[in-house]
Curated annotation (Swiss-Prot):
Gene3D superfamilies: Aldolase class I (3.20.20.70). It comes from the Bacteria. Keywords: 4Fe-4S, Cytoplasm, Iron, Iron-sulfur, Metal-binding, S-adenosyl-L-methionine, Transferase. Belongs to the radical SAM superfamily. Lipoyl synthase family. It comes from Bacillus cereus (strain ATCC 14579 / DSM 31 / CCUG 7414 / JCM 2152 / NBRC 15305 / NCIMB 9373 / NCTC 2599 / NRRL B-3711). This is Lipoyl synthase. Pathway: Protein modification; protein lipoylation via endogenous pathway; protein N(6)-(lipoyl)lysine from octanoyl-[acyl-carrier-protein]. Coiled coil: none annotated. It catalyses: [[Fe-S] cluster scaffold protein carrying a second [4Fe-4S](2+) cluster] + N(6)-octanoyl-L-lysyl-[protein] + 2 oxidized [2Fe-2S]-[ferredoxin] + 2 S-adenosyl-L-methionine + 4 H(+) = [[Fe-S] cluster scaffold protein] + N(6)-[(R)-dihydrolipoyl]-L-lysyl-[protein] + 4 Fe(3+) + 2 hydrogen sulfide + 2 5'-deoxyadenosine + 2 L-methionine + 2 reduced [2Fe-2S]-[ferredoxin]. The gene is lipA. Pfam families: LIAS_N, Radical_SAM.
Length: 297
């Protein structure tokens, strides 16, 4: 077994405390009863116990649980997706009420089988949550929806509080990590979102540990800022299974702190960086920080 394919042992700083209190079990039961999915479970997020048990937050995953893409880092199931569930937006909105969320993140599997990439259901979910939860801030995390401008406009017209779209990795590694998504297309998606709704903060995320260099990461930060992205999250890539891309490096907390300082020096309004940081980690704090800085500028 070569160093490139070795299933590396996680360092101490990546070990997490499991907490399965009544908040955790209650949320799990509610999701099952409403036939809803969360990216927390489907993508095997390491923060699920903190978010569900302590912070009582969750990221809803709409448009089913089967993705039409097969990115080599992702644990979400791939294959032929299910039919659209047109009642899903209302069930998500009802769940936000039941959970008493102040901030909700709505993401989705990629639906390349749909002409609009799922934009209509995405937009209706935003509107449904807004109707039933007028004081809840809403963050959306869509795929690139095929790079079709009309699809993005449909979503942005629903006026989410924050638009999040992840480039996932650096330019040099993008084709290997997510072959059916394109680095430049993601940058264009983020740029267009800001052009359509200048007052809505935009956000993106990068995983580290896939073989990128410091120079690669700085280039990616510059690319995001050149396309007016406001918020950046940086987290450690964790190999979901031996079928996925291997971890080539575990970044220590101190290196994440350095990367955060670099990101802030580039002009990002907020940067969340750490071994266990994921795109939706402390999302409520990120959107609040971005809005405060926008209001003060």
């Amino acid at each position: 077994m070569t160093k490139q394919t070795e299933y590396k042992r996680k360092p101490e700083w990546l070990k997490i405390k499991l907490n399965t209190n009544e908040n955790y079990t209650g949320l799990k039961k509610m999701m099952r009863s409403k036939n809803l999915h969360t990216v927390c479970e489907e993508a095997k997020c390491p923060n699920i116990h903190e978010c569900w048990a302590v912070r009582k937050t969750a990221t809803f995953m709409i448009l089913g649980a089967v993705c039409t893409r097969a990115c080599r880092f992702c644990a979400v199931k791939t294959g032929l997706p299910t039919e659209l569930d047109l009642q899903e937006p209302e069930r998500v909105a009802d769940s936000v009420v039941q959970m008493g969320l102040k901030h909700v993140v709505i993401t989705a599997v990629a639906r390349d089988d749909l002409k609009d990439g799922g934009a209509a259901v995405f937009a209706e979910t935003v509107r449904a949550v807004r109707r039933k939860n007028p004081f809840t801030s809403i963050e959306v995390l869509p795929s690139d929806m095929g790079g079709v401008e009309e699809n993005l406009k449909m979503l942005m017209d629903a006026k989410p509080d924050i638009l999040n779209h992840n480039i996932e990795t650096v330019r040099r590694l993008s084709d290997r990590v997510r072959a059916r998504a394109k680095y430049e297309r993601s940058l264009e998606f983020l740029r267009r979102a800001k052009e359509m709704q200048p007052d809505i903060p935009t956000k993106s995320s990068i995983m580290v540990g896939l073989g990128e260099t410091r120079e690669d990461l700085i280039e990616a930060m510059d690319d995001l800022r050149a396309n007016n992205v406001d918020i950046l999250t940086l987290g450690q890539y964790l190999q979901p299974s031996k079928k996925h891309l291997p971890v080539l490096k575990y970044y220590p907390p101190a290196e994440f702190a350095e990367l955060k300082e670099i990101a802030l020096s580039k002009g990002f309004s907020h940067c969340e960086a750490g071994p266990l940081v994921r795109s939706s980690y402390h999302a409520d704090e990120q959107v609040r920080s971005a809005k405060e800085k926008t209001a003060g500028s």
